[in-house]
């Protein structure tokens, strides 16, 4: 299945502790169906000190399921993503506005 959400997309969280917050996707894992959104779904990771890094409690963004994310359109509202053919190429478009993403 084609990727409806890609790295660099601005998204809003639909469910969970960060519901309603917006951020940018930093990485997507199609195999697990999850994405990491910058600054959202933060968990504290405890790391041991090593020669090149200081240990302690380090905040880290954890993956969010793609079903709990929606693309933000040009109006700033959450939208679903569709596909259509334009000039022989498959492009993504916002279902609310019809604009190409």
Curated annotation (Swiss-Prot):
InterPro entries: KOW, Rib_uL2_dom2, Ribosomal_uL24, Ribosomal_uL24_CS, Ribosomal_uL24_KOW, Translation_prot_SH3-like_sf. SUPFAM superfamilies: Translation proteins SH3-like domain. Pfam families: KOW, ribosomal_L24. SMART domains: KOW (SM00739). One of its GO terms (biological process) is translation. Part of the 50S ribosomal subunit. It comes from Dinoroseobacter shibae (strain DSM 16493 / NCIMB 14021 / DFL 12). One of two assembly initiator proteins, it binds directly to the 5'-end of the 23S rRNA, where it nucleates assembly of the 50S subunit. One of the proteins that surrounds the polypeptide exit tunnel on the outside of the subunit. This is Large ribosomal subunit protein uL24. NCBIfam families: rplX_bact.
